[in-house]
Structure formats: C-alpha cells, structure tokens
C-alpha cells in the first residue's frame, strides 16, 4: 500500500531526535539509551509495558495504567522492584527532562532483566528488572479513516497467553498486521475462538448500529483503558452500549466503526474487507464520543 495509515500515525517532529530516555534510573540522550543483548525482553519478549498519553500537563488515567502494569507484572511473576508511586515519579522526571506539556506519548517498559546465559528459563535473569521510559512528541495525524482486513490470527487465549497481559511478545499481532497489509488494508481485524468479532492487532474495536454502540464481550481482548472510558461515557450520556458477541455480518452492515486506544483515542474505520462502513468517513456517534472523551481528558 502506498497510502498506508496507522492507528499510531503522528506528525513528524524533529524534537524526537533529541529526546531524553529513562533507563534503569538514569536519564540519557536517545543515542545513548541502550540495554544488554542479554536482556530477557530482547531475547524472549519477556516483559510487560504500558502506553500513556499526556494532555495539557496531565498523564491521563495514570493510576489505572499503573494498576494494569503491576497486575500484569504479578501475573508473570516479575518483581518490578519499585512502587507505583516511584514509577509514576520516574514518568514525571522523564517528562521534566524533555520539557513536555502536551501531545506526548510515553511507552513504559519493564523486562525480567539481563540473563546470565542466552536461554529461556526465567531463573537465568538474575540482575533484577530492566525499566525503560521512551517519551515522544506525538500529535496524531490521520489523513483518512482506517481500512481493516479480517485475518485468521487470534489474540492469545486466557489459558495460553492471556490478551490482558500487555506483553512485549506481540508476534501474533505483528503477523496479523502483516496479513492485513498484504490484503491491501492498514491493520487487522481479529476474531475470537468462536468466530465472533473481537479486536484489532493494536486497538479495541467498536461498531455503531441504529444508535447503539457495540463492542466485544471483553473475554478475549485487551482490557483497554480507553475502551472502558468509552463504555463509561456512553452510559453516562444515555447512549445505549453493549458488550456482546457479534459477527462479521453484523459488522459489515454497521453504520459506523471505530477503534479505541491510548495513542489515538477514537479512530474511525472506513472500510472492512473491502466493504465501506457507513459513509466511509467518521460518523456522528464517533465524533460525539471523541468530543466527550476530549472533555474527559482535558484535551
């Protein structure tokens, strides 16, 4: 595709070449930010992460992001070695070092640390965790609605790699994205184990039908913070919203479709599997929810 669009698409910003990055308690220039080739995150994708957005000097829903990070770390038996408060302070310290006040995105990554030998067993990670905070100027730039293609790949299952783990290991999602791109789309629409519409490779997925907002049950997708905020906004503003099973047939005939995620908030979908969704442009419900969300985060 020559006109590829991504849910994480942002304006080019030359300032990002000179950002300061937090690495294990030290703030260093981008060119000097490094981790060991023996790091368990590099070798095996053994770690968890969070993405957090800065709007007008405030990190949106930072407490919920910290809760999710620490819950995921506990689930994989990874001791972060810091409190939630100290991790938040590291985020604020990195923000100050970069002089950022708005339209910034932070990726906070924690791995099991440096291994003594290049093999799988977690006991080989004996140095303590590795933590990195990358913070970039990231004003979203979306020239058109997203095009999706349904792919055969699925998110992890609760008994394999639970999708609620924001894991460094994203190979299934990367393969899904590759398949979608080869099908002429921007990103992938992924079904659940029962064949119902679930999520995309990078975001949670919603449709609008006859004034109702639908999203998946949440059983097989990331427990998205922006997803939950949209559900809450619908309920607070008398917009019918349902977490339910629905099929591709339901999806193709939707009036609107949109994605939710920390980076892009609410991203319109214009086409799925070659079918135009609604008018192919951002619909009135998506626009309304974007407005309500902007008020919520103070954007």
Could you describe each region identified by the protein language model?
Residues 1-189, 193-196, 222, 231-299:
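Conserved alpha/beta cores of soluble small-molecule-handling proteins
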Residues 189, 196-218, 223:
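Glycine- and Gly-Pro-enriched alpha-helical subdomains that act as flexible
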Residues 226-228:
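Secondary-structure junction motif
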């Amino acid at each position: 595709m020559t006109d590829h669009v991504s849910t994480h698409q942002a304006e080019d910003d030359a300032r990002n070449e000179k950002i300061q990055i937090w690495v294990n308690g030290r703030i260093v220039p981008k060119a000097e930010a490094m981790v060991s080739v023996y790091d368990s995150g590099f070798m095996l994708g053994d770690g968890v992460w969070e993405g957090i957005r800065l709007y007008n000097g405030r990190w949106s829903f930072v407490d919920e992001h910290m809760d999710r990070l620490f819950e995921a770390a506990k689930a994989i038996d990874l001791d972060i070695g810091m409190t939630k408060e100290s991790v938040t302070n590291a985020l604020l310290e990195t923000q100050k070092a970069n002089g950022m006040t708005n339209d910034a995105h932070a990726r906070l990554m924690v791995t099991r640390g440096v291994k003594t030998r290049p093999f799988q067993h977690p006991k080989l990670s004996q140095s303590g965790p590795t933590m990195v905070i990358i913070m970039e100027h990231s004003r979203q730039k979306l020239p058109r609605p997203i095009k999706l293609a349904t792919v055969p790949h699925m998110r992890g299952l609760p008994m394999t790699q639970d999708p609620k783990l924001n894991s460094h290991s994203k190979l299934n999602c990367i393969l899904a994205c590759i398949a979608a791109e080869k099908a002429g789309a921007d990103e992938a629409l992924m079904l659940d184990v029962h064949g119902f519409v679930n999520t995309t490779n990078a975001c949670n997925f919603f449709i609008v039908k006859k004034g109702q907002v639908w999203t998946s049950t949440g059983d097989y997708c990331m427990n998205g913070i922006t997803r939950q905020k949209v559900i809450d906004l619908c309920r607070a503003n008398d917009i019918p919203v349902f977490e339910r099973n629905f099929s591709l047939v339901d999806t193709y005939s939707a009036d609107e479709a949109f994605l939710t995620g920390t980076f892009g908030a609410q991203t319109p979908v214009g086409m799925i599997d070659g079918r135009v969704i609604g008018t192919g442009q951002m619909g009135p419900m998506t626009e309304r929810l974007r407005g309500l969300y902007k008020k919520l985060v103070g954007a």
